[in-house]
Amino acid sequence: MENNSEKKIVCLINPLAANKRWKRRRKLRAELVKTLPGSCLDTPRTKEETVEMTRSICPSADLVVAVGGDGTIADVLQGIFESGRQDRVVFGVIPFGSGNAFRKSLGIPRNPFKAIKYILEGDIFTIDLLQIEDRVAAFASVGSTAAVTGEKLRHSIPGLFGHLLAARKLLFYKRTENILELSGAVDQEGRQYDQLTINSSFLDCVIGNSNYFGYSWLVAPQARLDDGFLDIILFEMPPLIYIFLFPFIYFGWMQRKLRHFKAKEVVIRGQGLEVQYNGEYLGSMDRVHIKVIPAAIRITGNRKKADRFLVNRADRADSRSKV
């Protein structure tokens, strides 16, 4: 974008993010109002209202900024796509939630005051997203991590402590036989398939375009933000072994030894599959449909730090543009 003063920037702030710390962080609001030309709006309490607010402001916005965690990001992205303006609006992220996984793949610092710099001066580059049923997201999972997300939601336990407490559900998670139907698939040996069917009694199936998950967990080290594929990782082990290996899983070391696929689209069939996207619980279902949205949206970030998660590393023409 040529000139900040000539462009309409809208910040959508989740005041309930990060255990309502927003109420104690008036300084951040003052900095946003001072630094970013345009509007700073608090999002409503419900997801549906946040999506609707985003949809309503998109026709007059050039840059839409989500201030919150991964759930807020998912809601704002949903609103942008429902407005039909995803090819015209630039998306920005200022992390201020319990889970801020998405920002890490983009090279955006966790400190919200430092993140403001990348809204104004950051690189602009194009990334893929995924569509899970009728929702837009950067990552999703089917199985035990989704069950933990649902448990946390049911008991309204905030923050990291809530995740750790809800994680006890992992110990009792029962694996069942599931079928994955992949379209436009590539296996870990590089073999390509128009259609590929996989049987798996996975504990967890992670599907993503971005690399991080939850609390800076490098769950998908081989995913690329702009390769036009979903990254699919199968954790096919009992819960106790998963917990024992979790330090290696957290840093992405174990994933290269697991079954791993890329695909344009996947349908997962099973009984009572628990599903989450961007840390939001979608529910329990017997069939889940996920597909990649290639070149989905332009986003502001730190291209230098994000480079290892990008395919188009040599092409800087797009990223040289400043907001």
Task: Please report, for each region that a protein language model flagged, where it lies by residue.
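ATP/NTP phosphate-donor binding region
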Residues: 1-67, 74, 79, 306, ...
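Catalytic core of DAGKc-family lipid kinases
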Residues: 10-13, 20-21, 83-204
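Short glycine-/acidic-enriched loop or helix-start segments at secondary-structure transitions
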Residues: 22, 75-77, 103-105, 149, ...
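Short helix-capping segments at alpha-helix termini
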Residues: 34-35, 83-87, 277
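Short glycine-rich anion-binding loops that position phosphate/pyrophosphate groups of nucleotides
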Residues: 69-72, 96-99, 142-145, 210-211, ...
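Glycine-rich phosphate/pyrophosphate-binding beta-alpha loops
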Residues: 141, 145, 206-219, 281
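Short acidic/glycine-rich loop or secondary-structure boundary segments that cap or lie
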Residues: 146-148, 189-191, 212-216, 240-243
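ATP/nucleoside-binding phosphotransfer catalytic cores, i.e., glycine-rich phosphate-binding loops
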Residues: 193, 199, 224-230, 234-323
